[in-house]
Amino acid sequence: MKTRIKEFRNRYNMTQEKLADLVGVRRETIIYLEQGKYNPSLKLAYNVAKILNTTIEDLFQLDDI
Protein backbone atom coordinates (compact mmCIF):
# COMPACT_ATOMS: atom_id res chain seq x y z
CA MET A 1 0.00 0.00 0.00
CA LYS A 2 1.34 3.40 -0.95
CA THR A 3 0.75 6.36 1.33
CA ARG A 4 0.98 10.11 1.16
CA ILE A 5 1.11 10.56 4.93
CA LYS A 6 4.57 12.14 4.88
CA GLU A 7 3.50 14.62 2.20
CA PHE A 8 0.44 15.70 4.18
CA ARG A 9 2.34 15.68 7.47
CA ASN A 10 4.98 17.98 6.00
CA ARG A 11 2.28 20.43 4.86
CA TYR A 12 1.50 20.99 8.53
CA ASN A 13 5.16 20.90 9.64
CA MET A 14 4.20 17.96 11.83
CA THR A 15 6.73 15.46 13.11
CA GLN A 16 6.15 11.74 13.12
CA GLU A 17 6.17 11.90 16.91
CA LYS A 18 3.45 14.57 17.02
CA LEU A 19 1.22 12.68 14.58
CA ALA A 20 1.73 9.49 16.57
CA ASP A 21 0.75 11.27 19.79
CA LEU A 22 -2.38 12.75 18.21
CA VAL A 23 -3.44 9.40 16.76
CA GLY A 24 -2.50 7.41 19.87
CA VAL A 25 0.12 5.10 18.39
CA ARG A 26 3.88 4.75 18.62
CA ARG A 27 6.17 6.70 16.30
CA GLU A 28 7.30 3.41 14.78
CA THR A 29 3.75 2.81 13.55
CA ILE A 30 3.82 6.11 11.65
CA ILE A 31 7.22 5.19 10.20
CA TYR A 32 5.90 1.82 9.00
CA LEU A 33 2.78 3.46 7.56
CA GLU A 34 4.86 5.99 5.63
CA GLN A 35 7.11 3.23 4.30
CA GLY A 36 4.13 1.14 3.22
CA LYS A 37 5.19 -1.70 5.53
CA TYR A 38 2.02 -1.63 7.63
CA ASN A 39 -1.61 -1.71 6.54
CA PRO A 40 -3.65 0.30 9.03
CA SER A 41 -7.01 -0.61 10.47
CA LEU A 42 -9.92 1.41 9.16
CA LYS A 43 -10.07 3.28 12.47
CA LEU A 44 -6.38 4.22 12.33
CA ALA A 45 -6.62 5.29 8.68
CA TYR A 46 -9.68 7.42 9.50
CA ASN A 47 -7.96 9.07 12.49
CA VAL A 48 -4.80 9.87 10.53
CA ALA A 49 -6.86 11.34 7.68
CA LYS A 50 -8.95 13.40 10.08
CA ILE A 51 -5.89 14.86 11.83
CA LEU A 52 -4.28 15.68 8.47
CA ASN A 53 -7.54 17.24 7.24
CA THR A 54 -7.94 14.95 4.25
CA THR A 55 -9.65 11.73 3.23
CA ILE A 56 -8.55 8.12 3.50
CA GLU A 57 -8.63 7.91 -0.30
CA ASP A 58 -6.17 10.81 -0.58
CA LEU A 59 -3.76 9.24 1.92
CA PHE A 60 -3.72 5.60 0.88
CA GLN A 61 -3.42 3.86 -2.49
CA LEU A 62 -3.64 0.13 -2.96
CA ASP A 63 -0.81 -1.51 -4.87
CA ASP A 64 -1.78 -3.15 -8.13
CA ILE A 65 -3.30 -6.56 -7.55
How should these model regions be labeled?
Residues 43-58:
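DNA major-groove recognition helix of helix-turn-helix/homeodomain DNA-binding modules
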Residues 8, 42-43:
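Short, Lys/Arg-enriched C-terminal cap helix and immediately downstream tail that follows
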Residues 61-65:
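Short, charged recognition helix plus adjacent turn
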Residues 3-22:
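Short basic helix-loop element that most often maps to the first helix and adjoining turn
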